[in-house]
């Protein structure tokens, strides 16, 4: 079938799409853009004028095409926590991800994880030092935007560099599907995820708090620790404002 008779690829619908960005990263013609819906969730959209109908976006979509990459059978399960109490306190849970990430950095590898940027825009960043790793620590309960991170990761892997990618399971699956082969120098670490809201929801909440306290919010911690090992029953979050500093977000002041 010649190119003129080929059909525009059909991406998965909103009910299946996880905004993994595999299709967005694989398109060499930049014919796919990520569009935010009314809930602030991202979904891919094809520009018919730029699309050459190669079908690569369909091939790498983990919801449309099942692959057998990285199938290791039944997983082995371990329970652990970081012995260093200072670093453990700065992590949401036991600090296992920080320990693994630190080991990768000591081997001159690259660590990718979710971090807040300007206006608390959540995206994947690369950390190559322990200082840069601090931005990746702690949970962020909103959808992280991948942007073109997968392309950079592929270049690093093809150069033989060690890479650790940490993120939600759907983004890990999207990365591996985008790569289309297993890399011995790639490590991935996902987490138990119950679904995340779009950044538009969090943006509205941020605007609400800034109006309520008449101050600019600089960072937000959904599950802060009262001590190094946390405390059972702590149901509050912590917002840090430019002038007012830390303010607890409890039921009576949310």
Regions of interest found by a model, annotated:
Residues 7-10, 42-43, 84-86:
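A short, structure-level motif marking secondary-structure boundaries and short turns
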């Amino acid at each position: 079938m010649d190119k003129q008779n080929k059909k525009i690829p059909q991406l998965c619908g909103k009910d299946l799409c996880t905004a993994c960005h595999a299709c967005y990263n694989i398109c060499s013609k930049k014919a796919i853009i990520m569009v935010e819906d009314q809930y602030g969730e991202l979904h891919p959209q094809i520009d018919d004028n730029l699309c050459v109908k190669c079908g690569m976006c369909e091939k790498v979509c983990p919801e449309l095409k099942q692959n057998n990459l990285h199938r290791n059978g039944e997983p082995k399960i371990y329970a652990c926590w970081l012995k260093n109490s200072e670093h453990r306190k700065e992590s949401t849970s036991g600090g296992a991800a920080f320990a693994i990430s630190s080991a990768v950095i000591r081997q001159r590898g690259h660590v990718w994880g979710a971090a807040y940027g300007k206006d608390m825009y959540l995206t994947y960043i690369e950390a190559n030092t322990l200082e840069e790793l601090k931005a990746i620590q702690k949970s962020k309960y909103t959808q992280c935007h991948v942007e073109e991170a997968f392309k950079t990761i592929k270049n690093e892997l093809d150069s033989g560099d060690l890479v650790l990618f940490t993120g939600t399971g759907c983004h890990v699956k999207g990365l591996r599907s985008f790569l289309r082969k297993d890399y011995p120098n790639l490590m991935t670490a996902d987490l138990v995820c119950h679904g995340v809201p779009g950044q538009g929801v969090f943006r509205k909440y941020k605007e609400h708090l800034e109006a309520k306290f008449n101050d600019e919010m600089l960072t937000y911690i959904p599950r802060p620790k009262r001590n190094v090992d946390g405390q059972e029953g702590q149901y509050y979050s912590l917002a840090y404002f430019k002038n007012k500093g830390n303010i607890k977000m409890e039921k009576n002041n949310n």
